[in-house]
UniProtKB/Swiss-Prot annotation:
A GO biological process held by the record: ribosome disassembly
Protein name: Elongation factor G 1
Localization (cell): Cytoplasm
Main location: cytoplasm
SUPFAM superfamilies: EF-G C-terminal domain-like (SSF54980), P-loop containing nucleoside triphosphate hydrolases (SSF52540), Ribosomal protein S5 domain 2-like (SSF54211), Translation proteins (SSF50447)
Organism from which the protein derives: Pseudomonas aeruginosa (strain ATCC 15692 / DSM 22644 / CIP 104116 / JCM 14847 / LMG 12228 / 1C / PRS 101 / PAO1)
PANTHER family, A to Z: RIBOSOME-RELEASING FACTOR 2, MITOCHONDRIAL, TRANSLATION ELONGATION FACTOR G-RELATED
Length: 706
């Protein structure tokens, strides 16, 4: 079967934003204008096509990113047929993991901002994630029909708060209820949308006289930005003072792909004014799979050997599983992004991370929640594979003959835990199965059994995250559960450096004995430039002359890591530890891996007396938006919660207070902040860093460990 759309006419994009910027409505309009949906779904009716889980429809927020395949020929039919794969991403902080993993497999992003509230804390998080993966993006300032909407103010905020260079390619005509259309700065025409066909078509007219000067001014800065793309364009611009439409687009495209600029457009998705031009901008400025760098990876046999795959059907097959979803009809769906090669249904692939072969039963492409069965996928495609037995988010599925492990995704450590138990004993096993499936879908959610109490503990990124997990257990798996009080994920670290400790484990009482002996130097690991402490262990080997044979070194590392889980002060896991093994001895007969593991574990245990341990608590970055009348109460309350106020600013929606507050003080804050402000304040919170906990909290924790 030949390729139906050439790969240079593919666009794999995500629509990202903070809560309530109108992202799902924008995605809905994209599906409508590209001909997939004949009835518009509105989020506030609970009818949006991409929000296909029941909770999403009830809460009106998007939780799982659904991948949708659409086609676009341009707002005026000016292009050949382009295949646009859209991934809808959630905007709620508790689901940043979803955003992170969709950005990992995208080539470009449309970042949606609200014309009234502009750059919000969540937008900064999404922007940082997009920077991390080097994702080219365009900006769509939505909700221009809302009170207080101002396109150029949001453009200015992007520059100041996100440190990026936005280049408007449009201006808004009118604002709030008088918002009627846009000025196209490339064609220098005014665009007015047709209400009769829900904004499918528009008419072009002369620019209104009162906007002429402003349009000229912004056009010249746009042309200048395009000219800076390369010498050829710059020379032409300097000689003639002008560039053609095609040259402007080419210059802007080159600079967008290099992540130097961000083209900015505006509109109102809800009022059907502007989304077709957002799609045009996707085609004009965002990359095809062939225009992004080859994807890097390593050889499964030797992780020091680097390898890469280009977006080409002739290269060996490689793909990344970026999402696992459970479907009521077909079982497990594995969403995969194909980077190279071709895969047909019935083929076998290698899961190179787990070293297992899997047979692909069927493959489907999603059009929101309808699916179309397909026979093959090629480089650049995004599809859902059915019949995978053991695949986790972030696994590589590739050719068996030419295997590769693509770069893994980083998943954050959970910061909050609760004990969960089924309402009836009969549901115990069912609950275990349900939690196992949910953990396979969502790598930022963990399940473990507390060895002492035998309770099942679930951990996640925030209260909302865990609420939704419990809710899904009830709806999808029919398991009702009671949950305990939230527990904070405390950590511990040491304060002393260069503490040298001897670990010796000897059992020699006739017959085959045990002998392990090592000297380890412990220090606090370096923190990064933001003051964040490294999560795991930094391990180094400085043993010379074979006093400890090489094959026992991994056992020493394992012994340290296992003991780190037990902490040194109050039994919480140890982080930010650097350990260097530098001496020791062994016995020809009695030494084995187990003995060295125990010796290292014994040495680590002594840090409790010698390492100057301290307890760390998670600190959250909290941003509260409140009307001015309640500002005093909100700030007083944050101070009572041991919050450090970082700054304040005025916005259209009220005063914004930024603070860093320990997570342990934030439980139930959603209810408290609402009652303090008569329901008018809202807040968002994300993990910032670990910091030392005050002595009264440490005493209580030590007492609790008893």
């Amino acid at each position: 079967m030949a390729r139906t759309t050439p790969i240079n006419r593919y666009r794999n994009i995500g629509i990202c934003a903070h809560v309530d910027a109108g992202k799902t409505t924008t995605t809905e309009r994209v599906l409508f204008y590209t001909g997939v949906n004949h009835k518009l779904g509105e989020v506030h009716d609970g009818a949006a096509t991409t929000d296909w889980m029941v909770q999403e429809q009830e809460r009106g927020i998007t939780i799982t990113s659904a991948a949708v395949t659409t086609f676009w020929k341009g707002s005026r039919g000016q292009y050949d047929n382009y295949r646009v794969n859209v991934i809808d991403t959630p905007g709620h902080v508790d689901f940043t993991i979803e955003v992170e993993r969709s950005l990992r497999v995208l080539d470009g992003a449309v970042v949606v901002f609200c014309g009234t509230s502009g750059v919000e804390p969540q937008s900064e998080t999404v922007w940082r994630q997009a920077n991390k993966y080097g994702v080219p993006r365009i900006v769509y300032v939505n909700k221009m029909d809302r009170q207080g909407a101002n396109f150029l103010r949001v453009v200015e905020q992007i520059k100041k708060r996100l440190g990026h260079t936005p280049v408007p390619v449009q201006l808004a005509i009118g604002a709030e209820e008088n918002f009627v259309g846009q000025v196209d700065l490339i064609k220098m025409k005014a665009i007015y949308w047709n209400d009769d066909d829900k904004g499918m078509t528009y008419r072009e007219e002369e620019i209104p006289a009162e906007l002429k000067d402003l349009a000229e001014e912004w056009r010249s800065s746009m042309v200048e930005a395009a000219a800076e793309a390369n010498e050829e364009l710059m020379n032409k611009y300097l000689e003639e003072g002008e560039l053609s439409e095609a040259e402007i687009k080419e210059g802007l495209r080159l600079r967008t792909l290099a992540c130097e600029i961000v083209p900015a457009v505006c509109g109102s998705s809800f009022k059907n004014k502007g989304v077709p031009l957002v799609l045009d901008a996707v085609i004009d400025y965002l990359p095809a799979p062939t225009e992004i760098p080859a994807i890097k990876g390593v050889s499964p046999d030797d992780e020091t050997v680097e390898d890469e795959r280009h977006a080409d059907d002739n290269e060996p097959f490689s793909s990344l599983a970026f999402k696992i979803a459970t479907d009521p009809f077909v079982g497990t769906l594995t969403f995969a992004r194909v980077y190279s090669g071709v895969l047909s249904s019935g083929d076998s692939v290698l899961n190179s991370v787990k070293g297992k072969k899997e047979r692909v039963g069927r493959m489907v492409q999603m059009h929101a929640n309808q699916r179309e069965e397909i026979k093959e996928v090629r480089a650049g495609d995004i599809a859902a594979l059915i019949g995978m037995k053991d695949v986790t988010t972030g696994d590589t599925l590739c050719s068996i003959e030419k295997p590769i492990i693509l770069e893994r995704m980083d998943f954050p450590e959970p910061v909050i835990s609760v004990a969960v138990e089924p309402k009836t004993k009969a549901d115990q096993e069912k609950m275990g199965i349900a939690l196992g499936k949910l953990a396979q879908e969502d790598p930022s959610f963990r399940v473990k059994t507390d060895e002492e109490s035998g309770q099942t503990i679930i951990s996640g990124m925030g209260e909302l995250h865990l609420d939704i997990i419990v809710d899904r257990m009830k709806r999808e798996f029919g398991v009702e559960a009671n949950i305990g009080k939230p527990q904070v994920a405390y950590r511990e670290t040491i304060t002393k450096d260069n503490v040298e400790i001897e670990g010796k484990f000897v059992r020699q009482s006739g017959g085959r004995g045990q002998f392990g002996h090592c000297w380890i130097r412990f220090s606090a690991a370096d923190v990064d430039e933001k003051g964040n402490i490294t999560e795991g262990l930094v391990f180094e080997n400085e043993v010379v002359g074979g006093v400890v044979p090489k094959e026992y070194i991994p056992a020493i590392q394992k012994g340290i890591e296992e003991q780190m889980k037990n902490g040194v002060v109050a039994g919480y896991p140890l982080i930010g530890l650097k350990a260097t093994v530098f001496d020791g001895s062994y016995h020809d007969v009695d030494s084995n891996e187990m003995a060295f593991k125990i010796a290292a574990s014994m040495a680590t245990k002594q840090l409790a007396q010698k390492g100057g341990g301290k307890v760390l608590e998670p600190i959250m970055k909290v941003e509260v938006v409140t009307p001015e009348d309640y500002m005093g109460d909100v700030m007083g309350d944050l101070n009572r919660r041991r919050g450090l106020i970082q700054g304040m600013e005025d916005t259209v929606s009220g005063k914004v207070i930024r603070a860093e507050v320990p997570l342990g003080e934030m439980f139930g804050y959603a209810t408290d902040v609402r009652s303090m402000s008569q329901g008018r304040a809202s807040y968002s919170m994300e993990f910032s860093k670990y910091a030392e906990a005050p002595s009264n909290i440490v005493e209580a924790l030590v007492k609790k460990q008893g």
